[in-house]
Every structure is written in structure tokens, then in C-alpha cells.
Amino acid sequence: MTERLLIKALSGGKNTKIITLNGKKMTKMPSALGKLPGLKTLVLQNNLIPKVCPELCNLTQLTTLNLGNNLLEEVPEEMKYLTSLKNLHLSGNRICRFAPGACDGLQNLILLNLNNNHLTQLPQEVSRLKSLTYMSINYNQLASIPRELCFLENLVELQLNYNQLICIPEEIKFLKKLQKLLLARNNIGVLPEELCDLKKLRILDIAGNIIQIFPSGFQDLKLREFYCEGNPLFLQQPVISTQQENVWSLQEITSRFVMNQLAENNPFLMDDIERYPQVRSMISQGKTCAICGQYFITVWLECVRFVPPPKDWKISKNLKLVPLQVLICSYKCFTQRDPNLFGIAQV
């Protein structure tokens, strides 16, 4: 049956645009495919193919390639020759790596599906997928998101459910077009404040992680759907506690002075600071007190404010209050807080 279909396709020559050989128990990719340079769509899913044939390199007009549910162990190097490729489906394989150079020629790729594989990391070369709009890598073993992925400026949807992620890079803020972010069932403990810079984000799923509190600007996101069930969120259960005022280090006192002077555009400091990269690095970690608005480095006491989720959010069941992180610089500011702001106690 497979042979007849190939013979028929070959007889069409340059006019053959689509080949579908789904579920044919094929153990190798037919090398004869290389004689169809005008091929646009190639579907070889649900077979037993362990690697692609070298002749795949000839299919430079191919726009859709489906090799899902085969036995591939890597994203092959031959992919770099498919310069017209827009849709690449590689789900349900045994992929644990990208071959060197695999991403080099995929500047037109729009959709990449790597669900249900064995990836533990992504290469820095993913940054070369400049047109990528939809990326799905659910059910893998990723421990981190490379910062390079965050420079895919056309990315609209990113799915990383059921991995082993423990954090999200601050560079997430550069995904300005991102509308859908799925991170369910990972090991994420903290969401970066930079997540709140994603003005186009509409769907966020962080269910089944270990998140206790959300960044202070979280409520400003224009979400339509938000799912967070299965996280150990802080609850509004006040207890009586005491907190002593700290004695600041000289570094903290100096940093606060410098940052607050820079905020006032002190011309002498602005010129001098350029000559001291270590100082610039240190004050780049500065935070703003939610009470007095002054800058500081060391968090004196982490606080939380409980707010109801916006009414237009479609949310997880039973989510009544969202715990938002609030940072305060001193005991003095803590005593001036509003009654809906609580210090986080270790009990």
C-alpha cells in the first residue's frame, strides 16, 4: 500500500504537493521523497521511523511536516534545510536533544509541537526561530526556560505544562505579543515581577505548582482566564507577631542614598556611577517601598495584600482572594501600613 502511494506521488512529479502516509508501520522514511522538490505537506505520523532520510534536505518548499508518534531521538540537523517550513509536529517521539544546527534555517517556522518527548533542556539556538508564534512542549522534563527563548518576539502562545520547571526567567518581559502562557504542573515557586509587563497576556495557567504569593503588579494584567488551583497560596489568617527593626549595614544605607539621589537625577552621581559597574549591578536590584516610595535593597519584611480577582477574569474554582506581594523598607513604614496589609509570618 505504501509503495503504491509513493509510486502515484512520484508519477505526479513536481505537481505532487501533499503526501500522507499515516499509520503505515513504516520503519524508515522513503528516500524517494527527495524526488518531489515541490512537496508542500508531508504527513508521516504514527509510524516507527527512528530518523529522517538525508533526501529530506531537498524538500525546500515544504511548509508542513508531521512526524508525530514515531521513534525519533533528536530534532534532526536536516531540518535546517527546510527553509519554507511553517508547521513542524514532532510530538510523541523520544526526542531528548536538538542536533547542532537544527534551528539554523527555520526562520519561517510558525508552529512547533514537541509534546510528549524527553527533553530536559532547550538549546540557545531556539532564538533563531524568529517567526515562531506557537510553541508547545508539554509533557517533557524541562528544568528551566532558556533566556534566549524570551527573545522570540512573535511568540503568541507558549505551552510548558507537565515539566520540571522551578522558575521563570526575568526576560519573560520581552515576549510582548504573548497572549497564552500555560505552566501547569511544574515546580515553580515564584512568579517574577516582569511577568506583569506582558500587557497582551490573556490566558495564564499555573495550576499545580508551589506558588504562595503573586507579584505586586499581578492584578493589573488584563487576563480573561486564570487558573491557579493546587498551589499553597497564602491565606488571610492573621496571627499576632512581633518584628524588630533591623540595623542596616553600611552597604544598605549607602545604596539607599545613591538610588534615591539617582531618582532625583543628581547629575554628579549619574556621571560617577558609569565608572563603577559593580555599583550599577548592585543598585539594579533595587526595590521600591510600597508605603513611602523610597528605594532600598534588602527586604526588611515581606508583606501581603489580599485582593479579590477582577470580575472579568475566568478563574479557578474557590479562588476568593489573590495574595499580592508587597515590599516595605522599614519598621516605620510597616507601622504606617493600611489595615489590609499583613506581614508574612513563619508559623
From Swiss-Prot:
GO biological process, one term: intracellular signal transduction
UniProt LRR repeat ranges: 38-60, 61-82, 84-105, 108-129, 131-153, 154-175, 177-199, 200-222
Keyword NADP attached: no
Domain of life of the organism encoding this protein: Eukaryota
The UniProt record lists the keyword Cell cycle: no
Disulfide bonds: none
InterPro entries: Leu-rich_rpt, Leu-rich_rpt_typical-subtyp, LRR_dom_sf, LRR_domain-containing
Gene3D superfamilies with a match to the protein in the record: Ribonuclease Inhibitor
Keywords linked to the UniProt accession: Leucine-rich repeat, Repeat
Record-stated family: Belongs to the LRRC69 family.
PANTHER family assigned: PTHR48051, RAS SUPPRESSOR PROTEIN 1 (PTHR48051:SF1)
Protein name, UniProt field: Leucine-rich repeat-containing protein 69
Organism whose genome encodes this protein: Homo sapiens (Human)
Upper classification of the organism: Eukaryota, Metazoa, Chordata, Craniata, Vertebrata
Gene that encodes the chain: LRRC69
